Amino acid sequence: MRFLMFVAILFAVGLFLYRRRSFVEKSPAAQLTTGQIKQAWRELGFFCELDDRDRTWTLTGSRAGLLRFRDLLLAYVADPRHALQSEYEQYGPYGSLEVMTWPAAGFDGQSIRGSLPDLARLAGLVETKLAAAQPDSVLLIREEFAPDSAYTLRLDVRDDWFDPASADPDRLGAATKLPAPKTKG
């Protein structure tokens, strides 16, 4: 009986912390320069945007850039610190992309969440969908990962020279594409 009470209290505290964070406003890292913000998007490999109106998490990048999301998920799963419920990491220059350990898989207005096996499965889904993706295609993930989820993960696939910083709504990336590498001859 005491054990069940302890588990119920832990669950309530976890739920409280989870819900409380959704009310805390996320502010951009004011200390970052425009150049640092651009570089952070490029290092991440894709641009991330949450649209609460359309209930979508949109990741925009080249196939290689979007595969970094798969790698990010696999690294999250491999880190033993994330084994506990409510553990999370934030990514991107604004910390807007949040991956969270949670018993039920899903997408919501705060995070992309699930158990570690769920998040590993999501990484596999991303890899599988991107394997045959062509530039200018849009891939949706919800039914295969969390059919009851209110939000959808949208992968907006661009060409190989796409610059993720160019998708920032503040237009921090001036060019829409990175320059093509120079070829000999």
Model-based region annotation:
Residues 14-185:
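Positively charged, low-complexity terminal tracts
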Residues 8-14:
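Intrinsically disordered, low-complexity and often Lys/Arg-enriched segments
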Residues 1-8:
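Feature marks short, highly hydrophobic, charge-poor N-terminal signal-anchor/signal peptide-like helices
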